[in-house]
Amino acid sequence: MCATPVSPTPLPSTTPLTLRWRGSEPYEASFEAMRTFTDERTADTPDEIWLVEHPPVFTLGQAGNPAHLLAADSGIPLVKVDRGGQITYHGPGQVVAYLLLDLRRRKLMVRELVTRIEQAVIDTLAAYNLAGERKAGAPGIYVAPGPDVGLHAGAKIAALGLKIRNGCSYHGVSLNVNMDLRPFLAINPCGYAGLETVDMATLGVAAGWDDVARTFAERLTANLDGSPAAVAQPQAGVLTA
């Protein structure tokens, strides 16, 4: 376990933050929508967080090595994208949060943003009596050692990758809730051979996607804006924090 980065307590923000529930959506549709949103935003465009669940897809970061896809005949499409990081898998039962933020307006450095996203994951896991931890040099969140996690200590439960364009972020973070984990065996997750990937259900959490998505949205809002605003149950449409 590495030391927890120290991040200043976020102050209540006056910057509007909109939470959008996009439902189950093909990855390519979300990817193109993120790029379009970022290209077209102005200095006055409110920041947004999108909550999404994707059909099965592998995504490979802009500097990613295709050799980390170990089974090219898996039947799962591979999409090359412009985020940082290597290869990961998205699929049903995973909460994906895309963060479309104006970092200059929020006076956020990229490292601080990553720290706050990671803390939101840790806080979300804690709400379900799970302990998560960071690993130095390996963005994302991993299962902390404990009496109830057995051999899953050190397994990755959340992956993170961002793109910064003109001072604005897109892409984001994925949290494994209740998934078919077998596709992760077809890759070196995030470029690490033999890295175990786990979900909350495997660790004994019975909560479903909607419940975890709502909790995660609350924790993201609290870590970004400094106020634990209540977030309504995810549903089609717009939720404003």
Swiss-Prot record:
Keywords of this entry: Acyltransferase, Cytoplasm, Transferase
Binding sites annotated in the UniProt record for substrate: R83, G84, G85, Q86, I87, T88, Y89, H90, A159, L160, G161, G172, V173, S174
Reactions mediated catalytically: octanoyl-[ACP] + L-lysyl-[protein] = N(6)-octanoyl-L-lysyl-[protein] + holo-[ACP] + H(+)
Major location (coarse): cytoplasm
Active-site residues per Swiss-Prot or TrEMBL entry: C190 (acyl-thioester intermediate)
Family matches, as SUPFAM superfamilies: Class II aaRS and biotin synthetases (SSF55681)
EC number(s) stated in the UniProt entry for this protein: 2.3.1.181
ATP-binding among keywords: no
Pathway: Protein modification; protein lipoylation via endogenous pathway; protein N(6)-(lipoyl)lysine from octanoyl-[acyl-carrier-protein]: step 1/2
Domain BPL/LPL catalytic positions: 43-228
One Gene Ontology term from the biological process aspect of the record: protein modification process
Localization terms from the record: Cytoplasm
Enzyme class at the top of the EC tree: transferase
GO cellular component: cytoplasm
Record-annotated site: Lowers pKa of active site Cys: K156
Pfam families, alphabetized: LplA-B_cat (PF21948)
Coiled coil: none
Record flagged with keyword Acyltransferase: yes
GO molecular function: lipoyl(octanoyl) transferase activity
Stated family: Belongs to the LipB family.
Function text: Catalyzes the transfer of endogenously produced octanoic acid from octanoyl-acyl-carrier-protein onto the lipoyl domains of lipoate-dependent enzymes. Lipoyl-ACP can also act as a substrate although octanoyl-ACP is likely to be the physiological substrate.
Additional information: In the reaction, the free carboxyl group of octanoic acid is attached via an amide linkage to the epsilon-amino group of a specific lysine residue of lipoyl domains of lipoate-dependent enzymes.
Record-given protein name: Octanoyltransferase
Top-level taxonomy: Bacteria, Pseudomonadati, Pseudomonadota, Betaproteobacteria, Burkholderiales
